[in-house]
Amino acid sequence: VTSVFRAVAMLPVAVGLVLAVSAAGRAAFQEASAPPAKAARAPDVVYVPTPHDVVDKMLEMARVKKEDVVYDLGCGDGRIVVAAAKKGAKAIGYDLSRERVEEARANVKKNKVEKLAEIFEKDIFTLDLSEANVITLYLLPKLNVKLIPQLEKLKPGSRIVSHDFDMKGVQPDRMVHMTSQEDGESHTIYLWTVPLKKEPGHEPTGQQ
């Protein structure tokens, strides 16, 4: 509005000033009455980091190598992304938390893997996963199930690994129990390979 007043002040015709003030007033009213921008939704889970030795086991089970493209859905501080990039893979992390995204980007930079790793603040349920052939998860079971429609579109042979939580209605190819040397706790890692194997009597729909 200030810039409008400055421009109009230079006009020699008083009517021009009146018209400009009127237009500025309408614009200000429209801006004030416009609905507020929609805020990003809250993260789906409370962030709990995966112990580093569990991360290593997840990537080992997924057979991650430099030819792979790894997507970490709900990447937290980026430790899985960094570990995958250190194996030479292209690694991309997604998270809804601005704080976690900034932390993950800082960890990518700290570990000097910027050429292979990227972090994005995005809703994982809106993503096109077709570029990836390895997906890593540490989400709740109902969220794993909600991802099924997206996971089923992955290329054949793509691997999915989940820390601690299964995917109801889908049979894992492998399940490993381990005790972390980092936290002393027992952890379970699930591995699935695309095409996903539906368990008898179950038809996962991706609905909660």
Give the ranges of each region predicted by the language model.
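Bacterial N-terminal signal peptides
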Residues: 9-22
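Conserved SAM-binding motif I beta-strand of class I
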Residues: 90-95
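S-adenosyl-L-methionine
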Residues: 25-68, 98-131
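A short SAM/SAH-binding and catalytic strip from SAM-dependent methyltransferases
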Residues: 130-146
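C-terminal substrate-binding/active-site "lid" region of AdoMet-derived donor-dependent transferases
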Residues: 142-207
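Conserved SAM-binding loop of SAM-dependent methyltransferases across substrates and taxa
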Residues: 77-89
